């Protein structure tokens, strides 16, 4: 069949008339640059801030920089096999991690994937890592204690459920030890724990997990790990993942405790990402939003009221408040608490436990400096008996520090000053405590009672530890009912005071230490 020129012309006109111009939004883009875990993508028509972008090989990146003609994203994991020209897709969702009771007793990475070799995790679903913190109306004031098991902390710097208490100090002076002991002390309290390790050596984390297991606390704990060798993106996101896992319990009317070890390394990872994304640097080369990095994380730790829990659980849980208590850790350089990140976190939290190198080196462990350590809201949550007995402890230690410095220059001291110095020395000695040996409320009460009522005056300084060990052994064997009552009620009245006094008088007569 032959077509003449007129027919061909008509056919072309017909085709042109039928042609429709359709604009189609693409959710696929092309990688145009890869370097240091950062990829630059062209062609993504519709992408959210923080959205997960699917990469070749079932990997993901997170969109952080949304620019006019490109998207800057940070790769979650290894990026060596990515190349310019690779196709990527948007997913329409932000990062989510598994949550639920199935995570308790497990060691997971930032994405909630198990890394302990114990098989898959039976989770209750997924939750986004970035959520808005509960509002003022949904919160309840802090009035229940979290016992760390440390005399120095529970007596002078009490922590309440829903509080944010910073642990700050130089490297290698017991910050992690304090936090781990606080977790170990929760094994029978019903408080679920989350330990987030950021930027640490894998061997150090393995040691922590082993210690938790040895002391029976791992079954009650979720360990979230982003080691020093992992991508900066995973180190930056690990605290948010851990927080989401802890919020699962808070929102269902339970109490949980989370340790961020440590936020200095998270800030460094975020600085690295920001500089690679060409964001303008500020003080100490940190980006302008490094305060918001920590504030939006720590504000999620709170005590929520019963209405919030009832609404969240759709009426399944009634009359229960929930809490998420945070113990963020910050590492200082040569005791400089006025650096950028330390001052930021101090201003966000409800108090700080300051550990000092000089105290640690002098043998005082935990090396808590009571002078600049403070708990802004924990006083309302403190156990009654500890609160009543420990009022003079902080004053005695603060005055002792002052007088000890002064006495180095004074040749002769009056009797009152000498008595104050001796009392301060004994209280300082009494505050020493071994690692992995948390004390019950009753044990702490007896020790503080002995110090406050003058029972240590006749004890030699180097025998204080032996005196305390013998006293607690005596009390737990001879006066078990009294100790049980104190542990269960936490009350302090004339009867309990009388019983404590009588039992200490009896013990002092034995001279068995």
UniProtKB/Swiss-Prot annotation:
Domain of life assignment: Bacteria
Bilayer topology term: Peripheral membrane protein
Keywords per UniProt: ATP synthesis, ATP-binding, Cell inner membrane, Cell membrane, CF(1), Hydrogen ion transport, Ion transport, Membrane, Nucleotide-binding, Translocase, Transport
Sites marked Required for activity: 373
Compartment list: Cell inner membrane
GO cellular component: plasma membrane; proton-transporting ATP synthase complex
Coiled coil region boundaries: none
Pfam families xrefs: ATP-synt_ab (PF00006), ATP-synt_ab_C (PF00306), ATP-synt_ab_N (PF02874)
InterPro entries per UniProt: ATP_synth_asu-like_sf (IPR023366), ATP_synth_asu_C (IPR000793), ATP_synth_asu_C_sf (IPR038376), ATP_synth_F1_a_nt-bd_dom (IPR033732), ATP_synth_F1_asu (IPR005294), ATPase_a/bsu_AS (IPR020003), ATPase_F1/V1/A1_a/bsu_N (IPR004100), ATPase_F1/V1/A1_a/bsu_N_sf (IPR036121)
Quaternary state and interactors: F-type ATPases have 2 components, CF(1) - the catalytic core - and CF(0) - the membrane proton channel. CF(1) has five subunits: alpha(3), beta(3), gamma(1), delta(1), epsilon(1). CF(0) has three main subunits: a(1), b(2) and c(9-12). The alpha and beta chains form an alternating ring which encloses part of the gamma chain. CF(1) is attached to CF(0) by a central stalk formed by the gamma and epsilon chains, while a peripheral stalk is formed by the delta and b chains.
Family the entry assigns: Belongs to the ATPase alpha/beta chains family.
Protein known as: ATP synthase subunit alpha
Annotated source species: Shewanella piezotolerans (strain WP3 / JCM 13877)
This protein's encoding gene: atpA
């Amino acid at each position: 069949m032959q077509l003449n020129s007129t027919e061909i012309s008509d056919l072309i006109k017909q085709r042109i008339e039928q042609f429709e111009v359709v604009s189609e939004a693409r959710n696929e883009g092309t990688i145009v640059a890869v370097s240091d875990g950062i990829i630059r993508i062209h062609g993504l028509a519709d992408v959210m801030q923080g959205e997960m972008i699917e990469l070749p090989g079932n990997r993901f990146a997170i969109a952080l920089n949304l620019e006019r003609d490109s998207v800057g994203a940070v790769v979650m994991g290894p990026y060596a096999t990515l190349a310019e020209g690779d196709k990527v897709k948007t997913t329409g969702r932000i990062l989510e991690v598994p949550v639920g009771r199935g995570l308790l007793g497990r060691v997971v990475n930032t994405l909630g994937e198990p890394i302990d070799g114990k098989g898959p995790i039976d989770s209750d679903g997924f939750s986004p890592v970035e959520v808005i913190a509960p509002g003022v109306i949904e919160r309840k004031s802090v009035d229940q204690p979290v016992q760390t098991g440390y005399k120095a902390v529970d007596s002078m710097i009490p922590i309440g459920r829903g509080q944010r208490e910073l642990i700050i100090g130089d490297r290698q002076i017991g910050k992690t030890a304090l936090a781990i002991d606080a977790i170990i002390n929760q094994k029978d309290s019903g408080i679920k724990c989350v330990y987030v390790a950021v930027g640490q050596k894998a061997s150090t984390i393995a040691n922590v997990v082993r210690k938790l297991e040895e002391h029976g606390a791992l079954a009650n704990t979720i360990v979230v790990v982003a080691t020093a060798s992992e991508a900066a993106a995973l180190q930056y996101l690990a605290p948010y993942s851990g927080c989401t896992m802890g919020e699962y319990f808070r929102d269902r009317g339970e109490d949980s405790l989370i340790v961020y070890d440590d936020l200095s390394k998270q800030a460094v990872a975020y600085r690295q990402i920001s500089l690679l994304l060409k964001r303008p640097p500020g003080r100490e080369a940190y980006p302008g939003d490094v305060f918001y990095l920590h504030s939006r994380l720590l504000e999620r730790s709170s005590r929520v009221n019963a209405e919030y829990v009832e609404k969240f659980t759709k009426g399944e849980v009634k009359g229960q408040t929930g809490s998420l208590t945070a113990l963020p850790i910050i590492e200082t350089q040569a005791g400089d608490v006025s650096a950028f990140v330390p001052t930021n976190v101090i201003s966000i939290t409800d108090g700080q436990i300051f550990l000092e190198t000089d105290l640690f080196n002098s043998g005082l462990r935990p090396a808590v400096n009571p002078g600049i350590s403070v708990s802004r809201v924990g006083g309302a949550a403190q156990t009654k008996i500890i609160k009543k007995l420990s009022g003079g402890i902080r004053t005695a230690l603060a005055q002792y520090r002052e007088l000890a410095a002064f006495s180095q220059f004074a040749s002769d001291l009056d009797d009152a000053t000498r008595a104050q110095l001796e009392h301060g020395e004994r209280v300082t000695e009494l505050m020493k405590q071994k690692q992995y040996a948390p004390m019950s409320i009753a044990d702490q009460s007896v020790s503080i009672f002995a110090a406050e009522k003058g029972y240590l005056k006749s004890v030699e300084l180097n025998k204080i530890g032996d005196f305390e060990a013998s006293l607690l052994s005596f009390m737990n064997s001879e006066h078990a009912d009294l100790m049980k009552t104190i542990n269960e009620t936490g009350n302090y009245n004339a009867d309990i005071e009388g019983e404590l006094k009588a039992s200490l008088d009896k013990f002092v007569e034995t001279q068995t230490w």
